[in-house]
Design a protein with these regions (language model features):
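Soluble extracytoplasmic regions of secretory-pathway and membrane proteins
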Residues: 4-567
């Protein structure tokens, strides 16, 4: 019996070790006391199974001819110790949660995101062109990306595009990027050696998407399995790191990486979460590197995600004058603008993106906690460094601006997307897209923050911008707006007198605007010229390096509208 008992114990130990290995492999908990998941893993996975085994192993028995006979009860000390340890884990979670409560640390929460006051007109450059404005929402990017991949027959059967698009600033221009993903387990199994072949890059200004094929496939991705699963690969490299916000980015040369934010907790065990650094993983070989916030490469754009930053500002706005004031007096309490989330059926903090100084910044309006449909200011926060700027500007909140834009074309039933914020003649201005029921962008709209009765809409962004500037100059009086010259494209852009130019073509772009195709030519000296393709189909014969003579008229945005062109 003693020999059999030893074998049983050995078998139980092997089973227990296999249990620990398998559960860790699947659950991937951070081995960090600041993680609630660590304490739950310790209690329910590590301690509970041996505690249950010890609980049922309470007696010594003896086998006789008459059967099994209980000899004596065994004092169940191991079970008591193990259940006591489980209770201690639960107590640590409860005490840690209470110790980090806002009731005791209101000032600590309020000081996590440090904001500085800035003048809007001095900090945000006046907008002279709209090439740096990212107006596209994720749903529109998904639609364009799926359309691009759907046209590639060799890919569509094995891969699809991840819905997790990242907003980045690449070489000074906004861009949305998303990696392809395996279309299921068997597609991964069949392609696991060569990996995911590329990613989709979406231009939110031109509203188009391109598939980028990589020289070396990405093997360590979220849609992979077993050891090439991205999260598992990062966890095995950094077993104690509490990481999240894992997303896809590309550097300035277009090389792919996955970036994961690494969190720390400044208040108690589990309170005051913020980012202390980032893990950057090369998905082609699985190599991972950790960087503190101050050392993160400049090409990385999303380290502090928008949800975290808006939550941290709400701590600042609501708890700055103490916890009890946030509940009762609410003196000086403010919060980020909220929009209605139909999926969760509640209001959540929302934000837009602004490309500034080579980084992506989130912006959102700041309103009082009384929900009065007006803003008292704005914040702009750098997603890489968490540098936060506050602008004290009273005006309409984003929801009111969206309603004003929708009201301009209410008979069409278009819906406005969450706006971006720009500076026009030192006036803060909302700019947004209006989409139909299918999610297709139909119009662009601009709304003055301080006077949201100043609204313009147009089928393309340049025309909307031109009309808005005229309306602002006229003080919002549409009757006082001088329509000016009408160019040969039929829009209302005011043009200067015709001039003759001789230039050498440096680049050629075909852009779809309002259902028409326009040809944009960039000269070697930086001059931008455009003409509607339907008006001059000979434009298709132009090549980079051609020297051309044009008669053109310059618009207020600096673009030259071509009247005649010859080589």
């Amino acid at each position: 019996m003693k020999g059999n008992k030893g074998i049983r114990i050995a078998i139980l130990i092997v089973i227990y070790l296999l249990w620990l290995g398998c559960t860790y492999y699947v659950l991937l908990p951070a081995l960090n006391p600041h993680s609630i998941g660590f304490w739950l893993y310790l209690a329910l996975v590590v301690l509970l199974p041996p505690a249950l085994v010890s609980l049922f192993h309470t007696s010594d028995v003896k086998v006789t001819k008459k059967g099994v006979k209980m000899v004596k009860a065994v004092a169940n000390t191991p079970a008591k110790i193990l259940f006591g340890a489980i209770g201690a884990c639960i107590i640590i979670i409860l005490i840690g949660d209470i110790a980090g409560a806002k009731l005791f640390h209101a000032k600590g929460y309020a000081s996590i995101l440090k904001t500085e006051d800035y003048e809007f007109s001095e900090d945000i450059n006046q907008q002279t062109a709209l090439s740096m404005i990212a107006l596209m929402d994720t749903n529109s990017a998904i639609r364009l990306g799926n359309r691009e991949i759907g046209s590639l027959s060799d890919l569509v059967s094995q891969y699809d595009v991840s819905d997790d698009y990242s907003q980045i600033d690449r070489n000074g221009a906004p861009q949305k990027v998303s990696a392809l993903r395996y279309a299921g387990f068997f597609k991964w199994w069949g392609n696991r050696d060569k990996g995911v072949p590329g990613y989709v890059a979406v231009d939110p200004v031109e509203q188009n998407a391109d598939y980028v094929k990589l020289e070396k496939g990405m093997r360590y991705v979220p849609s992979a399995y077993f050891n090439t699963d991205l999260e598992r690969n990062i966890r095995f490299h950094y077993p104690t790191a509490i990481f999240g916000n894992t997303h896809f980015e590309v550097d300035e040369e277009g090389n792919p990486y996955y970036v994961a934010s690494v969190y720390t907790y400044k208040i108690g065990l589990f309170g005051g979460d913020t980012v202390k650094g980032a893990i950057i993983c090369d998905p082609t070989n699985g190599d991972c590197d950790y960087y503190d916030v101050a050392e993160i490469p400049a090409w990385v754009d999303d380290v502090f995600d928008g949800e975290l930053l808006t939550k941290q500002y709400n701590w600042t706005g609501e708890l700055g004058n103490g916890f009890w004031n946030s509940l009762f007096g609410k003196k000086g309490c403010k919060k980020c603008t909220e929009t209605y989330n139909s999926e969760d059926e509640n209001y959540v903090a929302d934000y837009g993106y602004v490309a500034k100084d080579g980084d992506i910044w989130i912006y959102t309006g700041i309103t009082s906690v009384n929900d009065d449909a007006s803003n008292i200011g704005f914040i702009l926060v750098n997603q890489r460094t968490s540098e936060a700027h506050y602008y004290s500007i009273a005006g309409a909140d984003e929801n009111s601006a969206m309603s004003a834009a929708e009201g301009e074309v209410q008979e069409k039933g278009y819906q406005a997307s969450f706006p971006s914020l720009i500076n026009v003649y030192d006036k803060p201005t909302y700019v947004m897209v209006l989409k139909d029921a299918s999610g297709i962008v139909k119009l662009y709209a601009m709304v003055n923050v301080e006077q949201y009765n100043i609204v313009t809409t147009a089928s393309n962004l340049d025309d909307c911008f031109s009309k808005y500037k005229k309306l602002v100059k006229a003080g919002g009086d549409e009757d006082a707006v001088d329509d000016g010259d009408t160019n040969d494209d039929g829009d209302e852009t005011k043009l200067k007198d015709p001039v003759d130019l001789e230039v050498t073509i440096a680049s050629i772009e075909y852009v779809a605007i309002g259902g028409d195709t326009y040809v944009y030519l960039e000269a070697e000296d930086g001059t931008i010229l455009r003409q509607k393709f339907a008006d001059n189909e000979s434009l298709i014969s132009l090549r980079i390096g051609d020297k051309i003579k044009v008669n053109a008229q310059q618009s207020e945005t600096g673009t030259y509208y071509i009247n005649t062109i010859s080589k």
